[in-house]
Amino acid sequence: MTNPVKIPHMPKSEYDNLIRRQYVSRIAFGACDQPYIAPFMYVFDGKFLYFLSTKYGRKMEYFSQNPKVSVEIEEYSPDMSAFTFVSLRGILEEVQDLAKKKVVRRQFVDMIREKKLSPLVLTALGHKPDDPLDAIVKEERSAVWKLTGVKDIVALKNG
């Protein structure tokens, strides 16, 4: 029997760069019979990942039942000749500090502008597409979550 080919691991500097380049993740919640996965935009401050979550839906129920999650971020070429991903297992915490929430919301506004995202992305954050972008900062239509207590990181690359 031949040994399987293994995808090489990425050093921390490389997966931090992957996290900085991307802005969409998938969060797997485990507080149900079967895992539930949902896409989330995020911002990264160099130490923590932050997410904005609308205040309705299954994710809120699963978060309140069990905040332990897996977060996955990926990048790949269209033909899959090169791909990278990082998976982080940790705990989501709802940010309560008003000043910190404002900073994170401002980071989201800056990221949306920098990436030139469609106004339709506002619907994923609890806003109408024709709302001003600064409504993200001024209004509390979404919860601010922070990934903490990361115990396990798997970061792999090919190409």
Protein language model features and the residues they cover:
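Extreme N-terminal tail/first-helix region
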Residues: 1-20
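Short, structured patches in soluble enzyme cores that scaffold and shape functional sites
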Residues: 31, 73-75, 148-151
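Charged, gly/pro-rich active-site loop segments
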Residues: 80-159
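Surface loops and adjacent helix of pleckstrin homology
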Residues: 54, 74, 157-159
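Short beta-strand segments
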Residues: 22-55, 72
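Helix-adjacent hinge/juxtasegments
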Residues: 58-93
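Short, solvent-exposed loop/turn elements at beta->coil junctions and helix N-caps
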Residues: 30, 76-77, 131-132
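Structural motif corresponding to alpha-helix initiation and N-cap regions
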Residues: 12, 56-57
